[in-house]
């Protein structure tokens, strides 16, 4: 078994991801209060994506006590994967060897769209994939820890067919994941922590996109990471981000009226 994929022997025991012992610093240098205010501005437009900022995601993960559940949500946050893409992941889809660990995601939405245009099942070997770097060392370490603790196999026998298949890391449904999120949101609310946007599996995808834009990732690169067929799908995030850029320039329109009158008189 290659050392480049997740395996129990390479597990590193570290404190829980986003634990209280970590320094309280933002992963991307942003003005968090200003970013919150600007997001409130964007929420006026129903067509714009609803997203969480990094501190909110970390706070939400704090209320997910189970490591297996926590790492699924962390995977959505760290990769921007669609929920069906994340639930399809196996250990072999991850390459965690330094210096550039990454995950290979099957771009399932594009596959579905293509299948709808053609008769029959999509031929094997033609499934679209994309590589997403895993740049957060805490995430990588916790993923290794989870696999080691839960002894997640590379393969398992399908009880229905009797065939040996690649074992999915998260053998759950979309509905189950939504239940996990709902329980975390409820636990946070009971502790006095609330979120101003509804949290669903897709919220993490939107949050990933906005986080990457805040980090300065070019739009074309983000398109590739998100698995968007058209750049127009990615550009929707810049409509939100444009509010931040414009606000930070603090463009002034007013000047003392008496000074303006004096200036015009001098020029005439």
Swiss-Prot record:
One of its GO terms (biological process) is DNA recombination. InterPro entries: DNA_brk_join_enz, Integrase-like_cat_sf, Integrase_catalytic, Resolvase_Rsv, Tyrosine_recombinase_XerCD. GO terms for molecular function: DNA binding. SUPFAM superfamilies: DNA breaking-rejoining enzymes (SSF56349). Keywords: DNA integration, DNA recombination, Plasmid, Repressor, Transcription, Transcription regulation. Residues 47-250 form the Tyr recombinase domain. It comes from the Bacteria. The active site is at residues 82, 114, 202, 205, 228, 237. It holds the Pfam family Phage_integrase. Belongs to the 'phage' integrase family. Acts as a repressor of transcription and as a site-specific resolvase that cleaves at the RfsF site. This is Resolvase.
